[in-house]
Design a protein with these regions (language model features):
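Short alpha-helical DNA-recognition segment
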Residues: 15-32
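Conserved binding/catalytic microenvironments
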Residues: 101, 105-111, 115-203
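DNA major-groove recognition helix of helix-turn-helix/homeodomain DNA-binding modules
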Residues: 44-59
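A short, Lys/Arg-rich alpha-helix, primarily the initiator
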Residues: 1-13
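Short, charged recognition helix plus adjacent turn
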Residues: 63-89
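Alpha-helical residues within helix-turn-helix
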Residues: 9, 19-20, 48
Length: 203
């Protein structure tokens, strides 16, 4: 579903007319085009429309995704479940998908996701024979986490997914880094909860 169609559904559910929502924000004709999927919208206008609907972006995207977690959250949830259930086949499928995304989009975070899955696979797959690869991948992930200037939700989840595999000294250093570099998000509940989980698991 396109974003405009999701907005229209929410607007109608709240009993707000096109004219009422568009008032002092944009023209009725523009809002109508956006809702039909015939026009894009700027972030600033979208923010104003959501504020009028008394809704934030997280809530809007949750509805847009058919009341399912977003792709990032879904990835960590699925990867963690496959690891805990020792589902090697699922881990391999996820890794293949992530690697294809990395090749297609050249976005480095897909690479780190693949490394995380490779680490999980090396632990649960009894036939896994590549010596030293798990340690090498963990080092690559650690290097990334130390290098990045600001930790957001992604970095915290990536670290949470690997911290139990790290040496105690490394965990202490990275947990301190996580706390310091994510401090600006302390009032954002989603990230704040992740910070608390990291600190709790460090103890």
């Amino acid at each position: 579903m396109e974003y405009g169609k999701t907005l229209r559904m929410i607007r109608q559910q709240k009993g707000i007319t096109l004219k009422e929502l568009a008032n002092n924000i944009c023209s009725v004709s523009f809002l109508s085009k956006f809702e039909r999927g015939d026009s894009d919208i700027t972030l600033s206008l979208m923010t104003k429309l959501l504020e009028k609907l008394m809704m934030n972006f997280d809530e809007f995207l949750f509805i847009h995704n058919d009341y399912q977690p977003d792709q990032l959250e879904q990835f960590f949830k699925t990867a963690g479940a496959a690891y805990l259930s020792r589902d090697v086949k699922k881990l391999k499928q996820l890794k293949e998908t992530v690697l294809n995304n990395w090749k297609q989009y050249s976005v480095e975070t897909y690479h780190y996701n693949a490394l995380l899955l490779e680490i999980y696979e090396s632990i649960v797959d009894t036939t896994y024979t590549t010596d030293g690869l798990k340690e090498y991948n963990i080092q690559l992930l650690s290097d990334y986490l130390f290098r990045v200037e600001v930790w957001g939700y992604y970095e915290l989840k990536l670290y949470s997914g690997t911290m139990l595999l790290l040496e105690p000294d490394m965990v202490i250093m990275l947990s301190r880094t996580a706390y310091e570099k994510s401090a600006r998000f302390k009032d954002y509940k989603k990230v704040s909860d992740s910070i608390i989980a990291v600190l709790f698991n460090t103890v």
